[in-house]
């Protein structure tokens, strides 16, 4: 919805198009010319905290906002998520489980990855960048699984999953329901369970789903670590941060402490902080984070014993992928041939 009389973008979203000159901070005329895209159809680009107009009468009637309210540019979802989580300085990182999942590192320079299996975006200022690894089906995997058992709510699921020992009784889940981004960049991968037996129950399967998503996010972390990025802890966000067993699974799989934001909608908080800077309420993003970002008291600390066990399961996870990659791709091909378009 257009709230002011200007159509704009910010540097983070613009940089995600691959048609943005990050050195000049403007659209790349060379790329646009090669693609035959007229520059005049693209929005003007400004910083995340830049005021770009005021609420028009039409927008006020549609939203209930007051006419003349200041409109600040804002930014891409992961940039706002990082601000709302307080991960705004180099060496800080977030792990997000929504429908998809992301690991995002705050950087003071653009990180080039010759393997092309991560994303690097402009950040909320010229001194900040985000490097991101992403898995396609994180919370989506658990939502899909739970939809098969409509009488089980998430509270019950979490309670029962917490009772199951790490490893889910020898199960491994490959969470490739929608293909995969980091590290495989392959739309033709498909999900599967490995290791089921007659004693396997739905709660073991559910825990295996959580563990499989965590293994996939560990792959994202390892790609970022190979690029020289490090962190001493992760700030958890998204719907996955509401699940205590899933948080503990992640801490054990990554061998890193997890801190949890007190606010569930971190991207919304990040947008509010950016607006506060643009409106002059805060002098900087850092000041806004100090004033507004809070964390829950409980941190999730990794268990050495569980991490060692999960390292074995993680190797099995990767071996299962290598052994079945061709099978998954063939299954996707046959599915499309029989009218299943995904």
Predicted feature locations:
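A conserved beta-strand/loop element that lines the FAD pocket in flavoprotein oxidoreductases
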Residues: 40-42
